[in-house]
A protein has these predicted regions:
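Bacterial N-terminal signal peptides that target proteins for export
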Residues: 1-6
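Conserved short S/T/G-enriched processing/targeting/catalytic segments and their helical context
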Residues: 10
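Extracellular/lumenal and peripheral-membrane lipid-interaction modules
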Residues: 18-466
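C-terminal motif of bacterial Sec signal peptides marking the signal peptidase cleavage site
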Residues: 13-16
Length: 466
């Protein structure tokens, strides 16, 4: 009898006071995470070689004895009357590491005459003329390429050794002039080096093309009506140059902080084009997706868990009963709060707080760690065995779930559609590989329950360098 009296006194005290709503921690929406968009750039070397090839003559020469050396063979100069022909093969580009090798084959003949003594009879000597085969040599040019911070190209070619395929011995004099000829060829090939550098530098002028892509990335894109994706580019990296399989490869990496938000089109923030640094060894992106569910839908799930449509869940206090008649849920950041009103032999308010859990397999939100707040505990736990036993708490933990499949799938599809499209001269590709919960937001009296999910995956692109 005494114990029952104590319980009634406690219940009376509970019904006489209204427990204030527990304050929720004030938090801002999740901060945008750093993400990476890698843009692969491949430049076939064959078209570059062909362009240079078209600008460099294939042949050069002078008919026999029409090229005068040291004034020609006649007195008083008493020099040499000469003639020659040089023909080259096509330029062939290859490479390895970060260097380009350009190879070219040469064939030539040489003929000259001199008066010995002077004046006197002409003595004629030659190499590579009929009946001999033309003489040959191989030329190689090595080109070092680098992309500078302003995305211009530094290109510098050097002539390698010119290797004779056979010797040029002037017969019948027996004079070997091969080495002198190779030195002369080196001087004559300097214009080819300059032409090669100019052509490669023009192919690698990436700044104008990347600037266009940078401007496009600054433009928000509408995922769904009223839902916008802003990429927010903030930096550029350059991938090291490599040459293999007759292609020069490099890449541009855009560092982004993508944001998905609701409302009107976000204001475009003009971001100056930055100098580039070295690309990071990363290829992932992460963006926070606000998945909005109407509060009425969430409320219906809570009502179902507590059987409110049928009058509410009833629990026993010995010979007394208490019934949950109303419930509300709101949230901010990493936690949610549930407000319960109950009536019966005792009236009162209780609050529970817990951390939402997102099951990626079922795409449901649940609240497995819901528990009464300290404000409620002081009033209820000492007076109501049903609360101590956790009947309502366990019911909510197991039955209160929010299906997120439809809004998540719709948002995921919208996002992947945007990540797989042409944006100016940038052809995007991307996929969402994983979703996990960051936080849940719904203020008291708010009409929308928003779950922020972190979408992680990969995004890459090709840029039109033509």
């Amino acid at each position: 009898m005494a114990r029952l009296g104590c319980a009634l006194v406690a219940m009376a005290a509970l019904s006489a006071c209204q427990t204030p709503a527990p304050p929720m921690p004030v938090q801002s929406p999740p901060k945008p995470q750093l993400s990476y968009l890698n843009i692969a750039i491949s430049i076939p070397l064959a078209p570059v070689a062909a362009a240079v090839d078209n600008e460099v003559p294939r042949t050069a020469g002078v008919a026999p004895f029409e090229y005068w050396v040291n004034g020609g063979a006649n007195p008083p100069a008493c020099g040499i009357d000469a003639g020659y022909a040089v023909a080259r093969g096509p330029l062939v580009m290859s490479g390895s590491g970060n260097a380009i090798r350009t190879d070219m084959a040469l064939s030539y003949w040489l003929q000259g005459r001199k008066q010995i003594p002077c004046p006197g009879d002409f003595v004629t000597a030659s190499c590579g003329t009929d009946p001999e085969e033309p003489r040959t040599a191989r030329v190689s040019m090595d080109t070092a390429v680098a992309i500078l911070p302003d995305l211009t190209a530094s290109v510098h070619s050097n002539l390698g050794p010119i290797v004779p395929g056979n010797r040029c011995v002037l017969n019948p004099a027996g004079l070997d002039i091969t080495d002198a000829l190779m030195a002369g060829f080196a001087d004559g090939l300097k214009p080819v080096l300059a032409n090669l550098d100019q052509r490669l530098a023009a192919e690698l002028q990436l700044r104008q093309r990347v600037e266009a892509g940078w401007a496009r990335m600054n433009e928000p894109v509408e995922l769904r009506p009223g839902i916008w994706l802003a990429m927010n580019p903030e930096g550029i990296g350059v991938a090291p140059i490599s040459v293999s399989n007759e292609e020069l490869r490099t890449g541009i990496q855009l560092r982004l902080r993508p944001v998905v938000g609701a409302g009107g089109k976000p204001e475009v923030v003009a971001r100056p084009f930055p100098n580039a640094d070295t690309a990071a060894a990363a290829d992932t992106f992460e963006m926070h997706i606000p998945v909005e569910v109407e509060q009425s839908f969430v409320q219906a799930r809570l009502d179902d868990a507590l059987d409110l449509k049928n009058g509410g869940t009833t629990v026993s206090l010995g010979s007394y009963t208490v019934r949950v008649t109303s419930a509300d849920v709101y949230g901010e950041g990493s936690q949610v709060a549930i407000k319960l009103l109950f009536k019966g032999d005792v009236n009162g308010t209780a609050y529970l707080r817990g951390t939402p859990f997102y099951d990626a397999g079922s795409r449901k939100l649940s609240f497995p760690d819901l528990d009464y707040t300290l404000e409620t505990d002081r009033a209820l736990l000492n007076s109501a065995n049903w609360v101590a036993q956790g009947q309502i708490r366990e019911r909510l933990r197991t039955r209160f779930t929010v299906e997120m499949d439809r809004p998540i799938e719709a948002m995921k599809q919208s996002l992947e559609n945007v990540l797989n499209r042409q944006r100016g001269n940038v052809n995007l590709h991307g996929n969402v590989q994983e979703l996990h919960l960051v936080g849940v937001y719904r203020l008291p009296n708010g009409s929308v329950f928003t779950a922020y999910l972190a979408a992680t995956g990969k995004i890459w692109a090709e840029v039109d360098v033509q």
